[in-house]
Amino acid sequence: MSGLPPFPRRSDRGPVTPPRVEALGFRLRHATDEDLPRLRDLYADTRADEVAAVPWPAMAKRSFLDHQFELQHRHYLVHYADAQFLVVEQDGLLQGRYYLQRGTEADLIVDISLVAACRGRGVGRALIEASQREAATAGRGMTLHVVRANVAARRLYERLGFQLAADDGGTHLRMDWAAPGA
């Protein structure tokens, strides 16, 4: 997609797919610029319910979502430049994204999104649990922000031990996880 800034070039060999994620038939790899059209579609998929209620023509909705994706992509690359920008694949098809920034005190899940057909199958849970194990080993906690209206995601995060940390009345809630014994 022309006009969008590229993903940072990675010098490492690539991420290791957590065993539980692999057992579910998925794998992780670094996002590339060639993924941008599919990531744009993924973004639109994650906001489909929200935008369905808006009385706009289909082309106006798509234009809005494309623009929102571009703004989000630019924001992530500027504010989380050192994050791991990973895509979740199944049978070679991009099915999701997992953007994770390692911190000194806490790791931040910048974004975790899966296409509708892959939600509720344990993939997100397996990704987060693997990240929690890694963070705990390093003595770090984890933080994420969830859309207030995304009750299913909030419930998952609560089951994984995340607790509400901040509610400023906006569209997102901050949730934190502390490693056991921390």
Model regions and ranges:
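Acetyl-CoA-dependent GNAT
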Residues: 3-15, 21-26, 30-34, 41-110, ...
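Short helix-adjacent coil turns
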Residues: 34-35, 122
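Amphipathic alpha-helical recognition patches that constitute DNA-binding helices
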Residues: 38, 108, 126, 141, ...
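Conserved beta-strand-loop-alpha-helix junction that forms the acyl-donor binding cleft
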Residues: 115, 119, 144-154, 170-180
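Conserved acetyl-CoA-binding loop-helix of GNAT-fold acetyltransferases
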Residues: 120-133, 155-159
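Conserved GNAT acetyl-CoA-binding A-motif
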Residues: 135-145
